[in-house]
Regions:
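N-terminal alpha-helical "arm" segments
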Residues: 1-30
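Basic, alpha-helical nucleic-acid-binding regions used in initiation and control of genome expression
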Residues: 12, 70, 74, 278-281
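Charged, alpha-helical interface segments at or near domain boundaries
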Residues: 22-216
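Short amphipathic alpha-helix segments
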Residues: 226-240
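A short linear hydrophobic-aromatic micro-motif
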Residues: 244-248
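C-terminal structured domain segments
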Residues: 251-287
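TerminUS-proximal long segments
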Residues: 275-311
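Non-Sec secretion/translocation targeting segments of pathogen effectors
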Residues: 316, 320-374
Length: 374
């Protein structure tokens, strides 16, 4: 677009002298769920890590009346502001190839498998039902956010480790970031009145005393915490805490909501709720999925809630058909046995006796039906 090219051609006028020889590039960057953004990279000297400044929000301001040169100035300001962090990260670049130094910085990221096929093509990925997990190295984590690089297949090969090793170390690093299961009511109260919601993960709740049974699973930083859902022992803890099976609502990449299966919630209604919230409340790149999950308390097995209901219906129908088939099989076998015995005993000309035996056969059939509840 003309706006992006104008920014590229004029941004040097707003930058310090050290950027005069910078080879400025525009690039399309694919983010979560197929969202594509336009970014600009402006190197400073021989710096190896170059921050990307995304232009899409500025373009929206431009089409709503903001002066184009003011937008260019904003891009320059953002690039200068990012320089300090880029220099800090640049110092750690040699360590990126040292797996022992990086493994504690790993983090699991989770997304909808169907929504992100192209984006995941070059990355280390593990599949978990409806979800795909990919992995990142968090070079810096603070209250303002996370600076990270994705774990690509080529980086894994440089490390000389397996996918399984990366997954195990990333899950351990995620646990070390803190696992939190909190009551949604307490979260709302803390936002209004202050205070910190209680972590319920190791508690055993009396659900009859919980007025609105809805809980949030995330990490201490509330950043990329939904991936904790993939850890079996955490799902087991949640089941023990609630004392029941539970539904998992994929609210965003940062957290998931947990609802006990208490007979109140219906899967079609939950799916509709998630889809509506995604469309109206959650930014596209932060949406996790629109597929509600069900988790069994005893086994900690998680599966698509809608497909689970369909599977149970199918199993129930098959079981019912099998029961019916078994009863009718017994009837046919009894009839065949009676016919075989009487054929040996009864002369063909004794029609009255045969009629009596037929009545006896009918009575036996009726008795079998009665005993089977049919």
């Amino acid at each position: 677009k003309e706006f992006y090219e104008y920014v590229k051609d004029n941004v040097k006028e707003y930058l310090p002298e050290s950027y005069k020889d910078a080879e400025i590039k525009l690039q399309e960057v694919e983010k979560n769920n197929g969202l594509k953004l336009t970014g600009i990279t402006i190197p400073n000297g021989d710096q190896r890590i170059v921050p990307t400044v995304y232009l899409d929000s500025l373009y929206q301001e431009y089409i709503h009346g903001k002066d184009v040169d003011s937008c260019v100035g904003d891009v320059a300001d953002m690039r200068i502001e990012a320089q300090g962090k880029a220099e800090f990260l640049d110092m750690g670049v040699p360590d990126i190839l040292d797996y022992e130094k990086m493994k504690n910085k790993l983090q699991v990221r989770i997304c909808d498998k169907e929504w992100n096929t192209d984006r995941l093509a070059d990355k280390v990925v593990t599949e978990h039902g409806d979800f795909a997990a990919y992995y990142a190295v968090n070079l810096e984590e603070n209250g303002e956010g996370i600076s990270s690089i994705p774990v690509t297949v080529s980086l894994m090969n440089e490390w000389g480790v397996s996918v399984e090793q990366i997954q195990a170390d990333a899950m351990m690093a995620d646990k070390n970031r803190g696992v939190q299961l909190v009551d949604m009511t307490q979260i709302v109260e803390s936002m209004i009145f202050g205070g910190t919601p209680k972590n319920l993960l190791n508690e055993k709740l009396d659900m009859e005393t919980v007025e609105n049974p809805m809980f949030c699973l995330t990490n201490e930083s509330k950043m990329n915490g939904a991936s904790l859902l993939l850890q079996e022992d955490i799902r087991k803890q949640i089941g023990e805490c609630l004392g029941s099976d539970f539904f998992v609502i994929p609210s965003s990449v940062h957290e998931v909501l947990i609802l006990p299966d208490n007979g109140i919630f219906q899967v079609p209604e939950l799916n509709a709720m998630v889809q509506e919230v995604n469309e109206t409340q959650v930014e596209r790149q932060e949406q996790l999925s629109d597929k509600v999950q069900f988790c069994d308390k005893k086994t900690a097995v998680m599966e698509n809630a809608e497909r689970r209901e369909a599977r149970l219906e199918k199993e129930k129908a098959a079981e019912k058909a099998e029961v019916k088939g078994g009863i009718h099989g017994r009837l046919e076998k009894a009839k065949a046995e009676i016919k075989a015995k009487e054929a040996d005993k009864v002369p063909k000309n004794k029609s009255k006796e045969l009629e009596a035996l037929t009545d006896k056969n009918k009575k036996l059939m009726n008795d079998i039906f009665k005993s089977s509840g049919l």
